[in-house]
Curated annotation (Swiss-Prot):
Purpose: This protein binds to 23S rRNA in the presence of protein L20.
Domain of life: Bacteria
The keyword rRNA-binding is annotated on this UniProt entry: yes
Record GO cellular component, one term: ribosome
InterPro entries found in the cross-reference section: bL21-like, bL21-like_sf, Ribosomal_bL21, Ribosomal_bL21_CS
Subunit description: Part of the 50S ribosomal subunit. Contacts protein L20.
Native source species: Vibrio atlanticus (strain LGP32) (Vibrio splendidus (strain Mel32))
Taxonomic path: Bacteria, Pseudomonadati, Pseudomonadota, Gammaproteobacteria, Vibrionales
Family membership noted in the UniProt record: Belongs to the bacterial ribosomal protein bL21 family.
UniProt-listed PANTHER family: 50S RIBOSOMAL PROTEIN L21 (PTHR21349), LARGE RIBOSOMAL SUBUNIT PROTEIN BL21M (PTHR21349:SF0)
GO biological process, one term: translation
Membrane-crossing residue ranges in chain numbering: none
Keywords attached to this entry: Ribonucleoprotein, Ribosomal protein, RNA-binding, rRNA-binding
Annotated protein name in UniProt: Large ribosomal subunit protein bL21
């Protein structure tokens, strides 16, 4: 059984027991989170596709940890001008473990 849900402007395909990183959610570690923007639920041969959402569809997950991703370096370089600008960015994330999928 798997589902596709929307969170943080992105779509994620998940199954029970899977862990994944989402955009930072404002919840505590160990808390349970419910995602109700479910776009598709598949259970073997049965596939429920929403238009745009599956009615009664829900994905529940447990928050494992919060953290920051790897550093992304941004470089702006002006040729022949002896000018260079460097910056870095580390995006916050929330790691969740999928505990249930309901259709």
């Amino acid at each position: 059984m798997y589902a596709v849900f929307q969170s943080g402007g992105k779509q994620h395909r998940v199954s029970e027991g899977q862990t994944l990183r989402l955009e930072k959610l404002d919840v505590e570690t160990g808390a349970t989170v419910e995602f109700d923007k479910v776009l598709l639920v598949a259970n073997g041969e049965e596939i429920a596709v929403g238009a745009p959402l599956v009615e009664g569809g829900k994905v529940t997950a447990e928050v494992v940890q919060h953290g920051r991703g790897d550093k992304v370096k941004i470089v702006k370089f002006r040729r022949r001008k002896h000018s260079r600008k460097q910056a870095g960015h580390r995006q916050w994330f929330t790691e969740v473990k999928i505990t249930g999928i309901n259709a």
